[in-house]
Curated annotation (Swiss-Prot):
<dbReference type="GO" id="GO:1990904">
    <property type="term" value="C:ribonucleoprotein complex"/>
</dbReference>
<protein>
    <recommendedName>
        <fullName>Large ribosomal subunit protein bL28</fullName>
    </recommendedName>
</protein>
<dbReference type="InterPro" id="IPR001383">
    <property type="entry name" value="Ribosomal_bL28_bact-type"/>
</dbReference>
<dbReference type="InterPro" id="IPR026569">
    <property type="entry name" value="Ribosomal_bL28"/>
</dbReference>
<dbReference type="Pfam" id="PF00830">
    <property type="entry name" value="Ribosomal_L28"/>
</dbReference>
<keyword id="KW-0689">Ribosomal protein</keyword>
<dbReference type="InterPro" id="IPR034704">
    <property type="entry name" value="Ribosomal_bL28/bL31-like_sf"/>
</dbReference>
<dbReference type="GO" id="GO:0003735">
    <property type="term" value="F:structural constituent of ribosome"/>
</dbReference>
<comment type="similarity">
    <text>Belongs to the bacterial ribosomal protein bL28 family.</text>
</comment>
<dbReference type="GO" id="GO:0006412">
    <property type="term" value="P:translation"/>
</dbReference>
<dbReference type="GO" id="GO:0005840">
    <property type="term" value="C:ribosome"/>
</dbReference>
<dbReference type="InterPro" id="IPR037147">
    <property type="entry name" value="Ribosomal_bL28_sf"/>
</dbReference>
<keyword id="KW-0687">Ribonucleoprotein</keyword>
Length: 89
């Protein structure tokens, strides 16, 4: 299974991890300076869940993001799946 959420479309993103040194200006310092940057990946918070589908009358095992899980709690599984199908068409 990929690291992409099938319901929200969230996927890994590329970015940088910054190394800083110095004392912040609000702490009466000279300011924070970036001394290095390293490439890294930001991964979505993926969760494997077993959810009950009332339409199919069975459990569905899905690997979804945490934000998709909140969306399912708010709208219901069938509405979220229908919305994802409409988006992909």
């Amino acid at each position: 299974m990929s690291r992409k959420c099938p319901l929200t479309g969230k996927r890994p993103r590329r970015g940088n991890s910054y190394t800083i040194r110095g004392i912040a200006k609000k702490k009466k310092g000279i300011g924070l300076k970036v001394t290095g940057k390293t490439p890294r990946c930001f991964f979505p918070n993926m969760v494997t869940k077993r959810l009950w589908s009332t339409e199919e009358n069975k459990f569905l095992k899905l690997k979804i993001s945490a934000s998709a899980l909140r969306l399912i709690n708010k709208l219901g599984l069938e509405k979220v799946i229908a919305r994802a199908k409409n988006k992909s068409l």
